[in-house]
């Protein structure tokens, strides 16, 4: 009986230790700011030009370009590290489609603005499927939500083909900012 009781206690302690260690592992890998494409804010002048459906944002037919903004909110533990990565999930089926994303900041006290990261889909080949690509940068200063506000500005663009017809089908599915 004593061996069986000791074995049960050992198993219970091992399980408890495993459960206590699991959240630390999960939290360490799940610290990222994310936004679905359909949660962006569209300029008043672009309201009829952008469709926010399912999880994506896309241009309406006949529209050449539009701008969508995504507010970046503080995420505990995310912004403390030198290398920041901006990941963009987008649709670029042809050479007439372009998507770009800029991570901006504005200083609350002075109104000074600047760009921290820039993503340009023209660096990646067209693909009939949605693709996920990233850009990284070593940012000396960490995010400071007490002194600055941050947002990602996404541009969706399509261009005209050789016959003068507007072609392309840019879409944005998601954005993610992560610390590496």
Specify the residue positions occupied by each region the protein language model found.
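Short, surface-exposed beta-strand/strand-loop-strand elements in extracellular ectodomains
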Residues: 96-109
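Noncatalytic modules at the cell exterior or secretory-pathway interfaces
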Residues: 140-164
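Glycan-recognition and processing domains
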Residues: 27-64
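Bacterial N-terminal signal peptides that target proteins for export
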Residues: 2-14
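Short beta-strands within extracellular/lumenal beta-sheet-rich domains
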Residues: 58-80
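A short beta-strand element within beta-rich, extracytoplasmic domains
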Residues: 80-93
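Extracellular carbohydrate recognition and processing domains
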Residues: 113-142
